[in-house]
Amino acid sequence: MTMAKNILRAITAIVRRDAKTPDTDDSAGSVTFDGALDDLDVAGLVEVGRGPIADIAIDADRETIVVTNSAADCLTVINPYTLAPVGSVRLNGEPFAVAAADDRAYVSVVTAGHDAIKVVDTITGSVLAEYPLAMTVTALAMSPDGKRVFVGRSGHDRIDVAVIDTAAERVGTIDLASGAGAGVDALRVDASGKRLYVATTDPRGSRMVTVNIETAQIESTVWIGAPIRDLALGADGKALVLTSDRQRRGVVHIVDLSTAAVVGAIQIGGAPTQLVLSPDATRAYVVDYDRVIVLCTLTNEILGSIDVGMQPAAVAVRRDGARVYVADYSGQVNAFDVAAELPALYSRLVASEPRQDATTVLPSLQTA
């Protein structure tokens, strides 16, 4: 059993190398920038060294970085200040998606008998809990307050979302649909924590479904068509839905959530697998099979792309928008600083509280 996004990534594992002549910074391997990305600077490179990285997440409170190493069956914690691995946690199963909050990492893990969500203490490296789940886990999301984890599941005759109450340690269910061939491809929770947006697919095509979390009822459905790879919630009541297929290749569909209608589209090409918005929703980082495409969501234009020299796997953006991390299938994480002041693109960053010493914040974990 594997996650839908990782199936696509495996299919597109052959890296296309385009001839480029942009500026290169040798301090982080063979990173190159293409297009109008003068505000991006290479901050460093993390050599995780445990094989391909499937996903990456940031714990917003401490800015701790966590990555899942699918081939090594472990989760690795990275110090954001030194850009060095703190340690790895053995998970006894193949990890894929990960979300993090409050010194906890929630990891979807495939084992021989079942799929599960494992909870890891990112300070001590202990596995605190495991939630075995029926069916196949294909998507993962967390509420803004970190109190609920949403898990998309696909079975042979139905799809649903398991809801984990992280405080009460209980699991509920939101039923979505029944029928053969259906799947859940992506999940997102809105800023209020009241609505869940679900990307679903069946033999007829794909849809984005809006669910009222408190009532567990579907409120609206938007027809998309092509297979959905990811989705994100932008500004002004808009959602960005990423699709790719052989006919149109990569497309970002713009959905008006108030009318539940597609109001625009951005053609990006390639075979993209992930879309992540900056905190102010002015930029979208799209993971393609050989680069990360950067979109301006204010103008719906492609600003440029980032080539890290390896096939990128996943992107994470710090909550102030000033740092972007690109994980790849070679087991590396490239860090990029984003300029704080860009006219018409970024709001002013809120001053953060003083950071604690890194050795106090992130004590060493037991190496897996």
From Swiss-Prot:
Subcellular compartments: Cell septum; Cell tip
A single Gene Ontology CC term: cell tip
Disruption phenotype: No visible phenotype.
Broad class of where this protein is predominantly found: other
Chain coiled-coil ranges: none
Subunit structure and binding partners: Interacts with MmpL3 and TtfA.
Function in brief: Stabilizes the MmpL3/TtfA trehalose monomycolate (TMM) transport complex under stress conditions.
UniProt protein name: Seven-bladed beta-propeller protein MSMEG_5308
